């Protein structure tokens, strides 16, 4: 009996579970307007139809919804009305599609082996898939089936699995050449994928709109085209010939792509839109970069361990992917086995897909002919040969002067982590025509480096230029710098550099700052070029000149004289040229490599360079390596031991001692920005001994050192032309021979030597290269003691040699992170003369910063350039402001003044030969020869005009970059015709919203150079007046705000809320000119108003406005305040703001883009009589007396427009400097009061995602037509109430106007901030329903409540009636009831 009872109980439980499961089948075409509900363990089967149209919500529990040609249960069950090979599914006008179970769509009959004319369109507002969503399409071998599928909800949240498959009639995967298209998302939609997408078979999947989340995407024989600017958190797996193609611009993040390789099942590939230029691969990090000829670089993480020789790149017209676009394709020729990435030193493989090089030849200018006067007096062959010889010799000599530009660095970061740092350095090489050109070496240092620790990233090198020269470049060093939380670091000089080629064509390369918070790496230089001046040190001129001189002068001179003259000219020219050129040998600057472990420095290696001579006598570069051993922890300062080694042995007496490395303590939560300005010394023409000393500083003070860079010194005594050969020809009388020899030897040789030396020295002196300035900052704890800036200029010592003078500018502190002060500055100048060159140690500047502050190093330098006539140039570089930033993180950009005084030595550069030339030679020969040499030298030298590299100043706020100012240089000509340097300033604003460009030309022959910036798109005027007066003591503040908004007559409901906050904080600048103010005198005035508008049923309801006034002084409604000051201080502010917001039009039209226009007029005035001389101020300010003071008036007129459509914005930074008299007993009668006025208008938009809790779906109205904000989720119950419901998109617009006035001398500031926040809800779909309360309950779903997951809530169940001919529902309820009765009886 017990076993029987147990059996019956089990049967009862089973019957209960069967009773919970419902199976419904619906056959034929369907147009469903009611919600589709599938409960748990239930099956709803739509089959046998060709057209399905759904226009209401879907709610699928843990059951199955099937829509297809054949039944879910049987392949042989279909409807007689089914249209063969046709299937159309439309899900539209649906708010929510929620799938927690299984949703299958099948557009073909199984085993039919037929193509289907199919279209699947899924357009719900919100699609949330937490289960499995699967589309099965059919493919036929040998035929092209081209169904279309679009899955484009406004908001797509995939927490489950999404499948799209193409199958044959046998159920296998179709992998034919005909690709089926499916679109996921649209440009205006939002997609979040948190689990799995899988495309199987011949599919072209087009991904549109922003995609985010954390998921896997499997491409099994499919192609995926990504046309999105946001594609984050997705890992793409290439399987069986799958391909990833990007048709959008490069992404900010690196996409992870697995499976690139070739196998038996297909070749996988990665492709980007455009034509290929080059690609690089780093085996240690697994990052590959594809660069197109359009200048776009795409980065992908493909994994480590690839063999670089197996990569294949090609350009595809798009035919392989059935696309009209061109693609740069990367494949791998063998299977790939995944390997673990390890950060270690390894070379980066680099390949130029298309080699493009442009070079221009200036042979026509460098080989200029001799003057016509010489041609007329000399034989034509002599004139041409002399011109050719001079040009050839000059060109050969000048080629060794090829100047290699300094390297530059580009750092990419994400948040507080550094992705990679790319260092591009340059070297000299030769192209196929034999021109000397610049090659580049790119070194990439991979991260990430978090801001909480110091890591030593791997360094690797790639070369982007291939040449036949035997120049090898190794990896460049990387100096890691520790930075700490709550700080931002802005690198100083990631800029653009330019350098001339041998034919003096300008080469420019650019570097763009990509990140807003980066750790600057020190600038390092990889010198791999060896200058061989052997061609210019030949003992004689080219043979063509000697033979031409001998043959062509024989007609006018005896043969012996011809040969002697040829020999003398050759020897003199060569000796003078060699002597002059050798002194221009350019020594590269040193570089530093620091190795660290955690927070400790292991050692620092400094490599410096000097000039020496190899065994053949060629002038080469030697290196001196100095190692400073550690460790140096960041909590203390230690003086490391040092050792020095020299890698080149020479005969010259060059002594070098170790260079110093001073480390500065950095506290936690601080940031350090290195300054890497280094100076190197140059040898003299005879390579006299060079001495360098080192200074070791053991305290937390960075020692500054004066560095002298001496240029070439030309000594013509040793380079005088040798006398004519003693064996004068016997054909002439001995007396004539000896006389002519003696005369020509002493006169011609000395004249040629003197003239050449004078011309060469005059020309070469203008090539004197002035080193860039450098900065040394001393700090104590979190305070900066002082900052010393050493800049350089050109001067002359007592023997007349051109040397380098230094100018030292000291900016005194301290500057703490709680305030910004304007330090006083003092300047001293030091000049070192004589030919012996002394060089002190090279500085390594570290800067310590305090918590919540950022420091930007001031390394903006300008070097001078020679004029066209190569006269002496003097320039000085003075840094005018310190780059210390307060907690507001608004960086002050430093200004650099480069003033140059140009001395015109045209009379001396073209000096004629001495008058004591032999009378036997034509008189025109001496003048012509002198003129020819000067002309040729001038023509050759002019192209060596050196353009300084540009520099960049970046202002940041927190982790955001406000703007970046790039100052670049170009060559121009002043009014006297001198070649000078002009500057171009380009300002890049955040998000490239607005940019302005200005040009500045440095005028010559002026003691001071003014800098003028013309900014467009801004209408701002400032007027300042000063007069002595005394007023009655009053203080008022007037604020007027006028706002208006208009709405069209429609049934669209709009919420417009505005909040304005205007007040003064701290002390008023203009009211403190002569009045003491304490904290008790400071009040705050706040005006707050809110407005809301709504429309009634007919759309003509007038607006209602609610305004509140709080904390406004005084209590009267006149909006007048007497808060600041007790007497005789007046400050007024009138702000008039008008706004118009056309946000919606009549029903059926798209809403208009919100616009904003404003006008601001501000007037502030302050005046007062003689103040009290007693002590005042609780903040420690000492008392002072002002017998008289001026009235300062400031008027600011601003007119700006902001339009969201094309992101227009105006931004103004204004400074006003006024002078007021003081008492007679004060030392400085004209103390300057610096006033800084800043105005800015910013706005932002935020399209609220309806899936987030902040979204609003509908607006229920009460009986009187007003919105019930306290009960959003309660539908109206009154029959007469109007209910308006649409598909809404919420847009938030924030506008902030800020006017700040500060007095940095007296620590006074006044600030007016007006903030407008608009939240507008507009009707995107214009779906409007107006019903009474009775029918509302049946036709309108309840308003969903926000949840952490979505706004989609279960709908009340709606019964689905079975159509005629449909399968019956399983009936188990009677059985269950019968068993239950038996159990009860037992």
UniProtKB/Swiss-Prot annotation:
A single cellular component GO annotation: extracellular region
Species classification: Eukaryota, Fungi, Dikarya, Ascomycota, Saccharomycotina
Location in the cell: Secreted, Cell wall
Molecular function per GO: cell adhesion mediator activity
Protein name: Adhesin AWP3b
Region (Disordered): 429-507, 530-553, 612-690, 714-739, 795-873, 1000-1032, 1140-1186, 1198-1227, 1241-1269
Broad class of where this protein is predominantly found: secreted
List of glycosylated residues: 117, 315, 345, 468, 526, 651, 709, 834, 898, 1008, 1017, 1096, 1197, 1229, 1287
Keyword Signal attributed: yes
Pfam families listed in its UniProt record: Hpf1_C
Domain of life: Eukaryota
Signal sequence range: 1-19
Disulphide bridges: 115-145, 144-178, 304-341
GO BP term (any one): cell adhesion
Entries under InterPro entries matching the protein: AWP2-like_YTTT_rpt
Bias type Polar residues, positions: 1140-1150, 1159-1177, 1198-1218, 1241-1259
Keywords: Cell adhesion, Cell wall, Disulfide bond, Glycoprotein, Secreted, Signal
Function: May play a role in cell adhesion.
């Amino acid at each position: 009996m017990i076993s029987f009872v147990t059996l019956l109980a089990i049967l009862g439980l089973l019957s209960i579970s069967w009773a919970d499961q419902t199976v419904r089948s619906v056959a034929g075409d369907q147009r469903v307007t009611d919600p589709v509900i599938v409960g748990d363990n239930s099956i709803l089967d739509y089959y046998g139809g060709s057209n399905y149209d759904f226009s209401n919500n879907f709610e699928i529990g843990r059951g199955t919804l099937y829509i297809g040609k054949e039944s879910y249960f049987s392949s042989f069950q279909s409807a007689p009305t089914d249209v063969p090979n046709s299937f159309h599914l439309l899900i539209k006008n649906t708010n929510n599609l929620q799938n927690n179970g299984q949703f299958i769509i099948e557009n073909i009959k199984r085993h039919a082996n037929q193509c289907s004319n199919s279209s699947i369109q899924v357009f719900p507002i919100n699609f949330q898939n937490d289960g499995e969503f699967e589309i099965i399409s059919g493919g036929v071998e040998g035929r092209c089936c081209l169904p279309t599928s679009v899955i484009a909800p406004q908001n797509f949240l995939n927490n489950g699995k999404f499948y799209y498959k193409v199958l044959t009639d046998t159920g296998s995967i179709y992998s034919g050449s005909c690709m089926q298209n499916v679109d996921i998302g649209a440009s205006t939609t939002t997609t979040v994928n948190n689990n799995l997408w899988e495309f199987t078979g011949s599919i072209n999947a087009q991904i549109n709109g922003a995609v985010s989340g954390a998921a896997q995407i499997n491409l099994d024989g499919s192609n995926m085209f990504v046309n999105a600017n946001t594609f984050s958190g997705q890992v793409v797996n290439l399987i069986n010939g799958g391909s990833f193609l990007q048709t959008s611009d490069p992404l900010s993040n690196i996409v992870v792509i697995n499976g690139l390789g070739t196998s038996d099942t297909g070749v996988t590939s990665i492709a980007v839109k455009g034509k290929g230029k080059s690609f690089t691969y780093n085996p240690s990090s697994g990052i590959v970069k594809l660069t197109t000829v359009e200048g776009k670089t795409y980065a992908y993480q493909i994994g480590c361990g690839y063999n670089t020789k197996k990569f294949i790149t090609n350009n595809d017209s798009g035919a392989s992917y059935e696309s009209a676009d061109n693609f740069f394709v990367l494949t791998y020729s063998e299977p790939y086995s995944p390997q673990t990435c390890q950060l270690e030193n390894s070379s980066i493989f680099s390949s130029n897909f298309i080699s493009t090089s442009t070079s221009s030849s200036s042979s026509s200018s460098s080989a200029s002919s001799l003057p016509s006067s010489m041609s007329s007096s000399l034989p034509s062959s002599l004139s041409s040969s002399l011109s050719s010889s001079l040009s050839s010799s000059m060109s050969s000599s000048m080629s060794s002067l090829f100047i290699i530009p300094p390297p530059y660095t580009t750092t990419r970061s994400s948040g507080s982590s550094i992705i990679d740092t790319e260092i591009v350095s340059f070297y000299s090489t030769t192209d196929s025509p034999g021109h000397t050109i610049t090659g580049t070496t790119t070194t990439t240092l991979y991260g990430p480096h978090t801001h909480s620790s110091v890591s030593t990233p791997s360094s690797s090198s790639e070369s982007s230029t291939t040449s036949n020269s035997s120049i090898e470049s190794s990896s460049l060093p990387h100096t890691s710098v520790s930075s700490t939380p709550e700080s931002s670091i802005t690198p100083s000089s990631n800029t653009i550099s330019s350098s001339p080629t041998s034919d003096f064509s300008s080469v420019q390369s650019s570097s763009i700052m990509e990140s807003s918070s980066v750790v600057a790496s020190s600038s390092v230089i990889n010198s791999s070029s060896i200058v061989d001046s052997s061609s210019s040190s030949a003992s004689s001129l080219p043979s063509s000149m000697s033979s031409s001189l001998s043959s062509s002068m024989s007609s006018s001179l005896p043969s012996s004289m011809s040969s002697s003259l040829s020999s003398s000219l050759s020897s003199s020219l060569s000796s003078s040229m060699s002597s002059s050129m050798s002194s221009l040998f350019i020594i590269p600057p040193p570089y530093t490599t620091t190795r660290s472990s955690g927070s400790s420095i292991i050692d620092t290696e400094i490599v410096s360079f000097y000039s020496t001579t190899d065994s053949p006598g060629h002038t080469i570069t030697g290196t001196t390596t100095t190692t400073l051993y550690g460790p140096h922890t960041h909590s203390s300062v230690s003086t490391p031991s040092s050792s020095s080694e020299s890698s080149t042995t020479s005969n010259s007496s060059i002594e070098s001692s170790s260079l110093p490395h001073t480390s500065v303590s950095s506290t936690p939560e601080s940031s350090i920005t290195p300054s890497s300005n280094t100076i190197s010394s140059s040898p003299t023409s005879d390579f006299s001994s060079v001495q360098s000393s080192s200074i070791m500083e053991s305290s937390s003070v960075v020692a500054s050192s004066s560095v002298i860079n001496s240029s070439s010194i030309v000594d013509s005594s040793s380079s005088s032309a040798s006398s004519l050969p003693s064996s004068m020809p016997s054909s002439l009388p001995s007396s004539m021979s000896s006389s002519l020899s003696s005369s020509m030897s002493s006169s011609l040789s000395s004249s040629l030597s003197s003239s050449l030396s004078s011309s060469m020295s005059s020309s070469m002196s203008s090539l004197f290269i002035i080193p860039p300035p450098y900065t040394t900052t001393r700090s104590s704890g979190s305070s900066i003691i002082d900052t010393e800036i050493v800049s350089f200029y050109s001067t002359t010592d007592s023997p007349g040699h051109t040397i380098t003078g230094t100018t030292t500018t000291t900016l005194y502190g301290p500057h703490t992170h709680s305030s910004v002060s304007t330090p006083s500055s003092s300047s001293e100048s030091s000049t070192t003369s004589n030919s012996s060159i002394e060089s002190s140690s090279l500085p390594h500047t570290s800067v310590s910063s305090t918590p919540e502050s950022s420091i930007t190093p001031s390394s903006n330098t300008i070097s001078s350039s020679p004029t066209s006539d190569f006269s002496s140039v003097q320039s000085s570089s003075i840094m005018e402001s310190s780059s210390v930033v307060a907690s507001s993180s608004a960086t002050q950009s430093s200004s650099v003044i480069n003033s140059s005084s140009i001395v015109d030595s045209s009379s001396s550069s073209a000096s004629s030969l001495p008058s004591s030339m032999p009378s036997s030679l034509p008189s025109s020969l001496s003048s012509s020869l002198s003129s020819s040499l000067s002309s040729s030298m001038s023509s050759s030298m002019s192209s060596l005009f050196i353009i300084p590299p540009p520099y960049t100043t970046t202002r940041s706020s927190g982790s955001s970059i406000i703007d970046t100012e790039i100052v670049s240089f170009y060559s121009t000509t002043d009014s006297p015709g001198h070649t000078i340097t002009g500057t171009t300033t380009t300002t890049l604003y955040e998000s490239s919203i607005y940019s302005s460009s200005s040009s500045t030309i440095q005028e010559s022959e002026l003691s001071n150079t003014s800098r003028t910036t013309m900014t467009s798109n801004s209408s701002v005027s400032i007027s300042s007046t000063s007069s002595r007066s005394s007023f009655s003591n009053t203080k008022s503040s007037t604020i007027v705000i006028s706002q208006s908004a208009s709405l069209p007559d429609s049934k669209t409901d709009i919420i417009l809320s505005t909040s304005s906050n205007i007040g003064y904080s701290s002390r008023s600048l203009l009211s403190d000119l002569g009045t003491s103010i304490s904290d008790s005198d400071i009040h705050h005035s706040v005006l707050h108003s809110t407005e809301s508008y709504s429309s009634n049923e007919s759309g003509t309801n007038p607006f209602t406005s609610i305004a509140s006034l709080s904390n406004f002084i005084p209590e009267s409604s006149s909006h007048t305040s007497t808060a600041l000051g007790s007497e005789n201080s007046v400050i007024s502010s009138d702000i008039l703001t008008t706004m118009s917001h056309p946000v919606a039009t009549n029903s059926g039209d798209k809403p208009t883009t919100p616009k904003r226009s404003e006008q601001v007029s501000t007037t502030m005035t302050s005046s007062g009589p003689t103040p009290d001389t007693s002590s005042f101020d609780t903040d420690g300010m000492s008392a002072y007396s002002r017998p008289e003071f001026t009235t300062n008036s400031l008027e600011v007129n601003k007119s700006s427009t902001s339009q969201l459509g094309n992101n227009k914005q105006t931004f103004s930074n204004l400074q006003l400097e006024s002078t007021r008299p003081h008492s007679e007993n004060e030392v400085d009668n004209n103390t300057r009061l610096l006033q800084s006025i800043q105005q800015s208008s910013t706005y932002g938009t935020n399209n609220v995602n309806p899936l987030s809790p902040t979204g609003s779906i509908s607006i229920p109205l009460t009986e009187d037509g007003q919105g019930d904000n306290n009960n959003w989720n309660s539908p109206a119950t009154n029959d007469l109430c109007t209910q308006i419901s649409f598909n809404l998109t919420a847009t938030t617009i924030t506008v902030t106007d800020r006017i700040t006035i500060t007095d940095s001398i007296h620590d006074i500031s006044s600030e007016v901030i007006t903030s407008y926040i608009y939240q507008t809800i507009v009707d995107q779909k214009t779906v409007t329903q107006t019903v009474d309360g009775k029918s509302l309950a049946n036709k309108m779903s309840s308003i969903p409540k926000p949840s952490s997951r979505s706004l989609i809530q279960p709908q009340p169940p709606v019964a689905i009636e079975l159509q005629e001919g449909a399968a019956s529902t399983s009936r188990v309820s009677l059985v269950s009831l019968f068993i239950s009765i038996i159990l009860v009886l037992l």
